[in-house]
Amino acid sequence: MESVEPPVKDGILYQQHVKFGKKCWRKVWALLYAGGPSGVARLESWDVRDGGLGPAGDRSTGPSRRGERRVIRLADCVSVLPADGESCPRDTGAFLITTTERSHLLAAQHRQSWVDPICQLAFPGTGECSSGSGQAESPKRGFVPMEENSIYSSWQEVTEFPVIVQRTEATSRCQLKGPYLLVLGQDDIQLRETSKPQACFSWPYRFLRKYGSDKGVFSFEAGRRCDSGEGLFAFSSPRAPDICGVVAAAIARQRERLPELAMSPPCPLPRALSLPSLEPPGELREVAPGFELPTPRKLPLTDPGPQSLPLLLSPTQEGPASGLYASVCKQTSKHTGTAEHLYENVCMLEASPGLTNGGPEAQEGPPGGRSPLGSPIYHNTEDLSWPGSAQDSNLEAQYRRLLELELDEAGSAGRSGAQAGIKAKLVTLLTRERKKGPAPCDRP
């Protein structure tokens, strides 16, 4: 049934809506009604179809020509602000009506002719429209000389703001609806009822994930550790930017009080009481039977020169003797300190009292198993078996070839006959040692 009360204002408006994820403007016929015995103050609108609705005095068209009816209760309005930054149809100006439920973006050819009556009906007794509409007409009233207020209190000292809760998933879960008082403390945000001083909910600043304000709505995202649980909370207020500024200042002050949160120095590592020793003292360890701890071999220091040294046996030998290498050095006429070594795996011999040169007293040398430059003996820790006849022929052929090359080199360089005699004795010695064969031993 059509309303019989006359509207305060009617005409064509454009309302923004989202269709398939795209913002578009819809042309509507709007009627602005004042509150009275027959109804509340409201703004009604219909979609314009088939030529649209005529003026208020000529509304004889039937209901078939009207689209969906939309009603905005002016008693639920929080703010009515111009929206200059929004793109709107040609030759129109946009304005935003924010209510407790949602926001409505409208556009009209004469924006101020709609904003003024809406503000007078939505905010009765104020004598002027909400912030923005009065500022739009202030230049037309002329310049008024003003003086600075020396006792002006900045907005940072204001900590209480009247707000209206916007409907979100988090506010619905917490059963928040209607007007409240938002109190901004030094450490948290508190929401109180207008008639009770007790706080309904509190959100510490350190538990807020995000916060901000847009189009007269202050919102923040609470974390899991808040009393209300995580979620988005939105509050409508004409001073939403001021609320956001107070929150930002409080967070900055809290960060200054806790400098370790902004920049925490790295924790130093514990300082060592003493440097590690290069040669740690001996330790007593329990080992399994048959296991030998690796120990550095002490090698003797001898003069370089052509010589054949006795075999080096382990002083703690329990099984077969380890295979050793006898080294033969060749002394050159120019470089007396450089030795070229030839190696032969001689045999495995048992301990003999005749080996006095290789005793433990004569085997003191640098630790680590490395032989010095003048030492012609290299110890082999592995247990090597005596080579077979095929290996003997290969070794003999290799050594003979090496000796022939050495003799040729010595002859070309004009070496003395004494050195050639030493080479011949060396061949005889190696042949005799090979014919002796390995000492008999019993292997498991």
From Swiss-Prot:
Swiss-Prot/TrEMBL keywords: Cell membrane, Cytoplasm, Membrane, Phosphoprotein
Region annotated Disordered, chain positions: 278-299, 354-390
Record-level GO cellular component terms: cytoplasm; plasma membrane
Mod. after translation: Constitutively tyrosine-phosphorylated.
Bilayer disposition of the protein: Peripheral membrane protein
Tissue expression: Predominantly expressed in bone marrow, spleen and lung. Low levels in heart, brain, liver, muscle, thymus, kidney and testis. Highly expressed in B-cells and macrophages.
Residue stretches making up the IRS-type PTB domain: 157-261
Domain PH stretches: 7-123
Annotated phenotype, changing residue 399 to F: No effect on the reduction of BCR-induced IL2 secretion, nor on the interaction with the SH2 domain of INPP5D or CSK nor on BCR-triggered tyrosine phosphorylation
Pfam families: IRS
Biased composition regions of type Low complexity, renumbered to the chain: 358-376
Protein location: Cytoplasm; Cell membrane
Modification sites for Phosphoserine: 138, 274, 308, 314, 371
Matching SUPFAM superfamilies: PH domain-like
Coiled-coil zones: none
GO biological process, one term: Ras protein signal transduction
Keyword Membrane in annotation: yes
Function: DOK proteins are enzymatically inert adaptor or scaffolding proteins. They provide a docking platform for the assembly of multimolecular signaling complexes. DOK3 is a negative regulator of JNK signaling in B-cells through interaction with INPP5D/SHIP1. May modulate ABL1 function.
Domain-level remarks: PTB domain mediates receptor interaction.
Family that this chain belongs to: Belongs to the DOK family. Type A subfamily.
Remaining remarks: Overexpression of DOK3 inhibits the transforming activity of v-ABL, the ABL oncogene.
Assembly and binders: On tyrosine phosphorylation, interacts with CSK and INPP5D/SHIP1 via their SH2 domains. Both Tyr-325 and Tyr-343 are required for interaction with INPP5D. Only Tyr-325 is required for interaction with CSK. Binds ABL1 through the PTB domain and in a kinase-dependent manner. Does not interact with RasGAP.
Protein name according to UniProt: Docking protein 3
Organism for this UniProt entry: Mus musculus
Gene it is expressed from: Dok3
